[in-house]
């Protein structure tokens, strides 16, 4: 692991050394942080809970990390890690969409994937990632109480604009749509969520 980290650091250093100012080439690192509106739903598949759902709609914290490199001018391929943390309590609803209970639990959608980001001449850019999605559910104030789903499928797409803040650094804003779905580990229900967010971006390229 130590050799891998040293090799990655050496690659990043050499990429920056040959990268031209105000161009999208070489090493690529993108960090984002912002807010989103997330719609989360858990639909029971088990007969004894038929018609019951768990829902959590509201404001979420939304953050991304993308790391990779440019394979052509203005085109970067990267690994993507995204987390959308729902700040709303989860609600249990019956078959008539009536709330029958409110829990002290919150949900997060996590995406691990591969993606691409392309920059246009005016530093407008589009980005997309596809990969595995996982949901975690925790009690508010107690991270040890809760659980996680099986791995499912998820994606993220976005469009944004950046301005140069240095020879290799860019700052800007990004709008994203993130989606994920997965079965729970007990196989009695399916989770899914989408989030529409606006985030600030910081890019080293």
Predicted regions and their residues:
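Feature captures outer-membrane beta-barrel proteins of Gram-negative bacteria and organelles
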Residues: 66-68, 112-119, 155-163, 192-203
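Positively charged n-region of N-terminal signal peptides that target proteins for export
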Residues: 1-4
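Repeated loop/turn-to-beta-strand initiation elements of outer-membrane beta-barrel proteins
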Residues: 74-77, 123-126, 163-171, 204
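Short glycine/proline- and aromatic-enriched beta-strand/turn motifs that initiate or cap beta-hairpins
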Residues: 18-85, 185, 189, 193-205
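Membrane-embedded beta-strand positions of outer-membrane beta-barrel proteins
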Residues: 29-33, 79, 114-116, 126-130, ...
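Outer-membrane beta-barrel translocator domains and adjoining extracellular loop/strand segments
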Residues: 41-49, 89-100, 136-149, 183-192
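N-terminal signal peptide c-region/cleavage motif recognized by signal peptidases
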Residues: 12-14
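Surface-exposed loop and membrane-interface regions of Gram-negative outer-membrane beta-barrel proteins
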Residues: 52, 82-109, 115
